[in-house]
């Protein structure tokens, strides 16, 4: 996700992506989109309930087909566990009772279940890992015992907490051994999920997805075709292409490389998508990740030029929520040929790379023209509302909510340890 900084320190050393400056492309005839329609996927982070004041109830649930609840952590044994039990299961929201009999779940988990109950097309997945916790994958993934523990405990959390599947965010396997271990980890999870599905009263298939890299130095190490056998879809992290680790300011989520300023586009979504397809991943299983934030460059004369520092940010230096954009005094530039945009304040010499509504619309065009599986966003707290919503813009560009995947969620969790969830959260 957004926690890619360490891995991206080496990005500027890569060979520039091949030039392609217009929306038409040289794909083979695209496959049909995701069965039943496009996927609309968003990450909800459990720490958003604190300073950001963003809670599950704030989600515009009818715009999404999948919410990825981030993040669970991993012990050396392979055990998957919740990272913040107060936020996840304990916090009492308005309407939650303190004297309710039984062993009950509250917090964001209860609110996620209620969203599903009121929006039967909405699926939720427990996302495991993320940038901060990714170092914890290596040890358990390396042994059969560790992989089994990972699969069994992630499945138990899914059954206890009312999720529709598991999302794995390992950033990133570093060599061939870890890449092979990742395949085996996915296999173990898929087998555990399918075994539970087979004995589940409703026979529902539970989902397995991953957050996948858009940088060649990371995805070229992966066994993409082998991984694909076990995955329902891929959430391609097509952002953080440029940032504080670079020598010049750049676009951080462009679709195509720039022919006029190639130094500003060290990577591109289009190259990653093409490489995944070439490796054997169907286009309709690739969900294009898009940012709901911008990356900043201070003391710069413009895009593709040197900078010094990144300035402030909404919650961390150099990173601004989309809802805080554009800043007063800044002029917005939209480059439709590469599907990228940025704001620049020439007096402050401050540049922020982020997606505008127009560029979000271009990305929706790219998804539809190339038979992709839909769109994904990091992360839900940062969008605007109404006509300025990037999520809403893309969903409308895909044809509206009626064109989204229609696949009913699961509400029956007879093996949950929580009485209220096992009973369907009666009012």
Curated annotation (Swiss-Prot):
What GO biological process terms are annotated to this protein in UniProt? chitin catabolic process; polysaccharide catabolic process
Q: Which InterPro entries match?
A: Chitinase_II/V-like_cat, Chitinase_insertion_sf, Glyco_hydro18_cat, Glyco_hydro_18_chit_AS, Glycoside_hydrolase_SF, Glycosyl_Hydrlase_18
Where the record annotates domain GH18, the positions are 38-401
**Which gene specifies this protein's sequence?**
CTS1
Indicate which residues are glycosylated according to the record. Answer: 387
Q: Tell me which UniProt keywords the record has, alphabetically.
A: Carbohydrate metabolism, Chitin degradation, Chitin-binding, Glycoprotein, Glycosidase, Hydrolase, Polysaccharide degradation, Signal
Family statement drawn from the similarity comment of this UniProt entry: Belongs to the glycosyl hydrolase 18 family. Chitinase class V subfamily.
**CDD domains per record:** GH18_chitinase
What's the protein called, per UniProt? Endochitinase 1
| Signal sequence residues | 1-17
Q: Which organism is it from?
A: Coccidioides immitis (strain RS)
What EC number(s) are associated with this protein in UniProt? 3.2.1.14
